Amino acid sequence: MATFVLVHGSWHGAWCWHRVVPELEALGHRVLAPDLPGHGDDATAPAQLTLKAYAECVATVIRGATEPVVLVGHSFAGIVISQVAELVPERISRLVYLAAFLPANGQSLSRLATADRDNPVAYLALHQEWINTRLAWYRD
């Protein structure tokens, strides 16, 4: 059986996998679903939220696994798992992009998001001040 690492998208936490985890475990797989920094139960300050911090969080989880993992990223986490694959390629057996951003080499999230201005993600990328306000509210 395999070890799955499930990485949630923006404004979610490990909780969003609550229906997936038992299904994979029932098939005999091991499942790890971390909260990214600043999401779910993680109290990292918004000023410390970077792609590097997200990638290191996931890489740390993967380094604790006993075998190469199936790394699954949802939505924004497509960017994260791409970065993790650069950090620990030998620890990953497969990457799975689940309705996720799949950036071209050197492409940023803001460039991906703003490529389609009718997309709600593009709206959020263009309105960073709203995101910062939302993060403050989420922590209250």
Regions found by a protein language model. Name each.
Residues 19, 83-87:
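Active-site signature of alpha/beta-hydrolase-fold catalytic machinery across serine-
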